[in-house]
Amino acid sequence: ATMLCFITTDAGVSRDVLELCVQSGVKSSFNCITIDGDMSTNDTVLVMANGASGVKLETPEDIYAFQQALAHVMLELAKHIVQDGERVTKFVTVHVTGGRTEDEAKKAAEAVAKSSLVKSSWNGNDPNWGRIIHAVGYCGAKVDEEKIDIDIAGLAACRGGVQADTPSDDLRQA
């Protein structure tokens, strides 16, 4: 499906600053979601600022506060888009920490989030952490499997690349 997102503000912000804020916000929100792995050529995020409030964003502190608020709005809207997706029954957030670089961590997160096998296990309430580790393995990032820990809903599924002591039934119910 095509995603159309329109955000308006009455703050007075220059076009250049607004563009930077939008790019930063999109990078950490809309560009991090996936439902079916497809992207429409018409997906759009449009932010308009008319300055009608008379509040001008000129200081670095004001611009930073605006950027943070805009990023928060974008993240919440991105979450809603996922939750409203066609045939969506689960909402899962993938967090990768300890990657060698931010790009490698993002590659690993995207591989897990887009994996049909991982999605199938989530949909079937099957805590198959092996599918997660498999997706991380093929993502192209350099990985030390002995350092991989996987939690499912806050419960340890894998520690140091091997199965943790958490009972499978507990993971299924998580």
Where are these regions (language model features)?
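A structural signal for small-residue-enriched, beta-sheet-centric alpha/beta enzyme cores
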Residues: 1-174
